[in-house]
């Protein structure tokens, strides 16, 4: 019996109990049953007592009637009040939780997280695709502007705005709850895009300083066309910056921060890659939406500002999707419980902005994450800006440019959807480290193909003419394929890898680290690529002349990216192991014995002599001490 009571500190039952005879209870209950059976007499267990809730319980033995000449044996009737009380005191259930209901092999509790998160991601990326395609058309095709404005915007406008937002976000994170912080950040975006479509763009001719910009251009010369264009079309540039911030703030900080808050690492491994399935369906549909509005502009009669009509329609969709995002966020906060984390986390301190930056810079883990983000931004920018310059030359009109971008977004969605289907298999078979290295490898290989075509396009002109293409058109298509494959790898593997890396961190590093990396490092990567290109142009005279050197820079950046991914893989694995060990230790510390050996303790029975009192009938003692009896 002692062996039974000591098993893992819990009251154990046999895995395959033998069926014993049961007798119907009299109307008076179990106590009257014993009183009514005169042939059965209690056999006291001297020297042994069980404690429940601090009170002594007198224990007795009751034997079955002799059936078919069975050997008489005594078994205790054990009560588990002590176990229940001990379990309740620690908040731990005495018995195993019953299995959660499932649908298609997935727990319903998990589905309550995954479906709304997938819908949120769908709406966020639907908006991002529309905003991304629209911002380039606005600033590149505006009167008095050109593609030269983009590097200046990324370096001298977008980066300072991103840094300013990060500083503000860090301060707000110290004083607002997570839910209030989410609404405080996303609602100004929704309001601005609605106001731009219905107020700012229709009235832009009244507050754009066109005459003043013309005077500056005549005075300073065409070399300053880009900076002057920022002043000339400042409201369009503000739209450009807000669209860029939507990608870094709403996608990276708000959505992924919320997803990391309510999911576990195991759920993230299984479902993070699948979040992109709904998101890339959004890419396909949003690409078709941009394509539709491009055709609408071309079908309107002369004298009608078709672009203004298109903007009103697209910004209305953006506002409606923003409302849906807020609804899904509200619903999840009201209906989904947060997962239990290891309690051994750092206490969140109140840090100043400079202290936060110093803390983040001192962390090797955060530095490696920042390297991944900056390297991606520089690498994709080195190829993408060069590709957009060729795209502008091939499709100079806004209608053609926007129509091609709609097709590009649709193709990106299809390619990414396919990669999403493979991503979970990649995570399961090869792990986090291999998945993190796929994106830089893809970008390197496709980038080499694109730059090679730019360098050796002239000798290939006769061959390309047989297929009805010029070297310029071929470069546009190859560059489009490079961007499609790189972005699909980013959405399906790079983003989930990056977000999974935040999960083992403590809450303070997670919140402030995401703000610093996603809001500052992402624009820093793009601005860094733009600065490299500006330096190359000033040094070698043109973008075409600097193409071989840009390819060399791309190689160095990607190699640094791969090194940071390898370093982060080791740190991530170590943190996961430490967190799992902490959880195991916490669970082990909560397990306590059930039956007390004295009136004050909860320890197991100390000796077998208490089960065999002196002077008692040893034959009546339990002959099967390790097999509990069904009563």
From Swiss-Prot:
Alphabetized UniProt keyword annotations: ATP-binding, Chloroplast, Membrane, Nucleotide-binding, Plastid, Transmembrane, Transmembrane helix, Transport
Cited Pfam families: TLC
Region (Disordered): 586-631
InterPro entries (alphabetical): ADP_ATP_car_bac_type (IPR004667)
Its membrane topology: Multi-pass membrane protein
GO-annotated molecular function: ATP binding; ATP:ADP antiporter activity
Entry GO terms, CC: chloroplast membrane
Localization (cell): Plastid, Chloroplast membrane
Residues spanning the membrane: 106-126, 149-169, 180-200, 238-258, 271-290, 313-333, 369-389, 407-427, 442-462, 465-485, 543-563
Keyword flag ATP-binding: yes
Record's keyword annotation contains Ribonucleoprotein: no
Biased segments, Polar residues type: 595-631
Family named by the database record: Belongs to the ADP/ATP translocase tlc (TC 2.A.12.2) family.
Name listed for the protein in its UniProt record: Plastidic ATP/ADP-transporter
Originating species: Solanum tuberosum (Potato)
